[in-house]
Amino acid sequence: MRWIENVERFVFGSECLGCGKGSERLDPWLCPDCVRELEREAEECRCPTADAYSLFPMRPLTRRLIHALKYREIPGMASYLVKHSRVVGGMLGAELSLLPKPFYFVPVPLHRARFRERGYNQAEKIASALALATGGRVCRWLKRKSFVVSQTKLSKGERERNVADAFVSALPGELPTRGTVIVTDDVYTTGATTGACLNAFGRDFPLMLKVCTLVYDEPASAVADYVADCRMDWEYNSEL
């Protein structure tokens, strides 16, 4: 309806978040060309390890959308990316169909200081979108017990030490007897954060454990992505 489109233009603006060009055909964040590009990138979904799935590779477009999710107060970007992924159909859907059901999506917890700063936990938004798409549930079975510095500029070993023992399990008194626990986060780089989350469940945890993130970023390119993120953040703040 026309009035809905007008509200979307007022709230989100008329510039594509992908290419920055003005467009009257946003849906509501990307122009038709960038939507097609996003769906092409979804065909390149990654499996960084045997136990981890990522819906998209890190590309300039997906980096901008992740930046919008985390820093531009657009939590709806999580469901938007899941919607345009292959989490139901395609290779990833086929992989998930082999796992025991139901799915219990456990978001990587955000420290209270970060939550106050951002207003929401992007991992929870991702978990909710994945649960809706697959018929799963969101379960807050992890707690963060320490605040860690940004992982982006650290090596794999430094990342692992940075998040070691940062999480503890917060399991219900009675666990389900079947299904798959899927730890969710926005970006998979070296697996240090999600690995620390998996370790928090302990060796004798009775359910299958997996990881699912929105994007996979090659460790070698993570610093360049950090620089690009900082540049986009500066450009955005300078407009305010």
Where are these regions (language model features)?
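Glycine-rich phosphate/pyrophosphate-handling loop used in enzymes and phosphotransfer proteins
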Residues: M1-L240
